[in-house]
């Protein structure tokens, strides 16, 4: 991947109150897309509150590019049913990457991000310093569906020899 500035690790933790698509339940999985990159979690059978705890890693060459999360109900014989989508707003996360972490103690809050029309946050999100890393936990409100949220955590991974953004 040309002009790689780093990697974005997305830990897809769990789904909350996802819609039922198959007889009072669903078999959900998540697809994360950024540009031409498309990654997916494993499916969880018979759950509207799945625990994925899967890590997906995207190569980032443009920090302003959109990251989309889509939830689907896995179907064996027909096309997968959409269960909602959300935009992952990574701009506030990238803006704090230049923070000097040498003086930070574990658990230090670097920034708060409030829900707005510019993001899909279901509640306020905190960017924190934890165990030598800058992390952001988010609960995303799914769009284009009756109900559902997805809890994720993002982490920046520096790539040796990459240029600063």
Swiss-Prot record:
InterPro entries: C2_dom (IPR000008), C2_domain_sf (IPR035892), CAR1-11 (IPR044562). One of its GO terms (biological process) is positive regulation of abscisic acid-activated signaling pathway. Gene3D superfamilies: C2 domain. It is found in: Cell membrane; Nucleus. Binds to PYR/PYL/RCAR abscisic acid intracellular receptors in an ABA-independent manner, both at the plasma membrane and in the nucleus. Belongs to the plant CAR protein family. This is Protein C2-DOMAIN ABA-RELATED 8. It comes from Arabidopsis thaliana.
């Amino acid at each position: 991947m040309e002009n790689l500035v780093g990697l974005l690790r997305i830990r897809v933790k769990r789904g909350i109150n996802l819609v039922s698509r198959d007889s009072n339940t669903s078999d959900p999985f998540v697809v994360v897309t950024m540009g031409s990159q498309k990654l997916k979690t494993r499916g969880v059978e018979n759950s509207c509150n799945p625990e994925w705890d899967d890590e997906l890693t995207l190569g980032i060459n443009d920090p302003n590019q959109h990251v989309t999360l889509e939830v689907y109900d896995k179907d064996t014989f027909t096309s997968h049913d959409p269960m909602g989508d959300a935009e992952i707003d990574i701009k506030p996360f990238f803006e704090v990457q230049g923070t000097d972490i040498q003086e930070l103690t574990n658990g230090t809050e670097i920034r708060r991000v409030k829900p707005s029309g510019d993001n899909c946050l279901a509640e306020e999100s905190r960017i924190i310093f934890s165990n030598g890393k800058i992390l952001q936990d988010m609960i995303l409100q799914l769009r284009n569906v009756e109900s559902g949220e997805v809890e994720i955590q993002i982490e920046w991974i520096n790539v040796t020899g990459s240029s600063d953004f």
